[in-house]
Amino acid sequence: MPRSLKKGPFIDLHLLKKVEKAVESGDKKPIRTWSRRSTVFPNMIGLTIAVHNGRQHVPVFVSDEMVGHKLGEFAPTRTYRGHAADKKAKKR
């Protein structure tokens, strides 16, 4: 279920402060964050945000199509290695 419109979008304050500081200074260095629950705001466009996926920080370059989505959507937490192959079917 989406968030109520009367509440508005959510962003962690510490991340918002880092984004505003980077926009003011024009710094292009990636912003490291563990806040996967924060919503992408329009003032983040053009910044690189390193989102933690549980093991490492995944660099995410924010574009205008990402606005309104959560940061965690762009840093997958699970790796899919495929199902085990059936050895009987391979011999035929």
Curated annotation (Swiss-Prot):
One of its GO terms (biological process) is translation. Keywords: Ribonucleoprotein, Ribosomal protein, RNA-binding, rRNA-binding. Pfam families: Ribosomal_S19. GO terms for molecular function: rRNA binding; structural constituent of ribosome. InterPro entries: Ribosomal_uS19, Ribosomal_uS19_bac-type, Ribosomal_uS19_CS, Ribosomal_uS19_SF. Protein S19 forms a complex with S13 that binds strongly to the 16S ribosomal RNA. PANTHER family: RIBOSOMAL PROTEIN S19P FAMILY MEMBER, SMALL RIBOSOMAL SUBUNIT PROTEIN US19M. NCBIfam families: rpsS_bact. This is Small ribosomal subunit protein uS19.
